[in-house]
Amino acid sequence: MSSKLTVYQATTSMADSPRDPFQSRSQLPRFLATSVKKPNLKKPSVNSANETKNPKLASLEFQLENLKNDLKRKELEFEREQIELQRKLAEEHEQKNSLQLRLTLVEKQLEEQSTSYQKEIEEVRNEKEATQVKIHELLDAKWKEIAELKTQIEKNDQALSEKNHEVMVSNQALQMKDTNLTNLEKLFADSREQLETKCKELAAAEQQLQELSVHNQQLEESIKQVSSSIELEKINAEQRLQISELEKLKAAQEERIEKLSSNNRNVEILKEEKNDLESKLYRFEEYRDKVATLELENEKIQTELNSWKSLITNELPTPEAVSNKLVFLQNTNANLGERVSSLESQLSNKPANQPLGANEKDAAHITELETKLKELHEQNRRLQRQKSLATQEIDLLRENLKSYDDEEAILSEKNTDMKKLERIEGLVKLVDEYKLKLESMPVSLDVDETSDEVSLQKRRRKNEHKDAGYVTELYRKNQHLLFQVKEKTNIEAFLREQIITLESSIATLRQELAQVTEINSCRVLQHRSNPTLKYERIKAAQLEMLNAENSALKALLEDKKVDCLPIQSFKIAERKALDLKKEVAEREKRIQRLKEIFSVKSLEFREAVFSLFGYKLDFMPNGSVRVTSTYSREDNTAFIFDGESSTMKLVGNPSGPEFERLIRFWCDERKTIPGMLAALTLELLDKND
């Protein structure tokens, strides 16, 4: 069965009359569905007796006919598949031939490119070797220069202290030289004007000389003709005198020109010396700033040392006092331990009249209370340690602030911000207040604890026989103390948080002050990424290359024998080629990105069309669009719309022969391709149902 490939012009009119569009949907042409022939269900004409006798034979004949029909249908399908495979083979063969041709062309191009690249690589290798040799030589020279510079730097560092005095003297000399320079510049300008006038006079004198020489030649010629030699000798003598005077004038002018040129050189030397002295002055100022900062740091360290020394001398003036204090603390600790042991023994030696259960309960309760007391004491010790550390940190920060303020007052006397300083002082006062509150808190705690202990001891002495009441009283007091400790710890935590916030605000204010002082003291000369500098460098490099090329071309013009171009022109062309390659690479990247974006967007568009209209769109490389229906059971059948030739092709094997009527009615008469596609979808839906 031959495959159909029908082409329809969208604007042509068909000769046949259109069918009625209001007919029933079942009478519309069938598309993309295989018409399966129904098997012949007619039973063979046999006698009724034979039918009754052989029903099995009739059923077998019926099955045989069905099998024959199936076999024919399968043969037809096989033929159709064979034709399609042959067509695909032919297409693949054509594609293979075209690909082979392309491959040969590409191989030739690659061979040419490889040869050119190999030549370029060899040239580059040679250039690289030469450049590496040059680089090694330059590196050796630079290392030697660096060593020499290091020695010079060491010498300069040693001579810096001596040159500080010289700088002061040189400043005065500089001022004198500046005045001399201005005078010399004025003299130079005057002498230049005089020189120009003298040059003009010289040119006029040279013209006169030339005229006189011409006149002399004329006279010499006339001497030959005229016999009176005495008059000619007089004229010659006068001319010789004039020539000698002019030569003397010329020599004097040349001497004056030499003097002025030497003066000009001296002026340039003085300018260079002035620049050197200015750079030395700048370095001297930097060293002076460093000395000031070092002095401030030294003063700070000395104040810290003095404070530590005063503490040691005031509280503990001698090492004997330190040892005595240690012994005293050890004795107090031992006394307290003895007191605790005596109290424990008193508790253990209670009267025997008390029941055992109560004693055990009281002992357990007392142990619990003792553990709680120990925990509280440990917490108190920790808090005291934290407090001491915090006070030390605050003192250090204050000293740093004072040193910073002193530095600021010394360095920038005018640019001090009074508001910020007042704010810092207020914050410091707040910190002092919180510190006083923290110091007052443990004192009140100690007072409460001591008063409670005294009252407890009195009650113990008075009411030793009433241990149960004593324990309850102790428990109540302990609870009260715990509550007080919790309150005090909460207050202390709150105050510590406030201290931390104040310290952070002080740190931020310091940073702001430092930034302000840096901004006031620093001067931005040039940024790192300066586009104007980059442009100027590129421009300078291009100008150098062009000047080199120009000089080489001039040399070529002078030497007419040379046939080849200079290297500079080749370098410029190479640079242009590199720029073009960069542009091409950027454009290729851009095109690739646009292609990727277009593929993503086209996929979205195709999916939208597929979900809305039920047609799959495939964009071909030649610009045409392949349209296949989702409801068709045959994948090969599809429409191909070509925009350039404005044609619509049907590719594949449409099963319905009435498809031409559908195209006549919708495309030729109604001239709507969307209507035809909609009718097709309805027809395929009916068939599938």
From Swiss-Prot:
Q: Which UniProt keywords apply?
A: Cell cycle, Cell division, Coiled coil, Mitosis, Nucleus
User: What family classification does the UniProt entry report for this protein?
Assistant: Belongs to the MAD1 family.
Q: What does this protein do?
A: Central component of the spindle assembly checkpoint. Has a role in the correct positioning of the septum. Required for anchoring mad2 to the nuclear periphery.
Q: Where in the cell is it found?
A: Nucleus
What organism is the protein native to?
Schizosaccharomyces pombe (strain 972 / ATCC 24843)
Which GO molecular-function terms appear in the entry?
Answer: kinetochore adaptor activity
Q: Name one GO cellular component term.
A: mitotic spindle pole body
Main location per the UniProt record:
nucleus
Q: Which Pfam families match?
A: MAD
Give the coiled coil ranges: 50-423, 486-601
Q: Where is this region: Disordered?
A: 1-54
Q: Which GO terms describe its biological process?
A: attachment of mitotic spindle microtubules to kinetochore; cell division; microtubule plus-end directed mitotic chromosome migration; mitotic spindle assembly checkpoint signaling
Name the record gives this protein: Spindle assembly checkpoint component mad1
Q: Where is the composition biased (Polar residues)?
A: 1-15
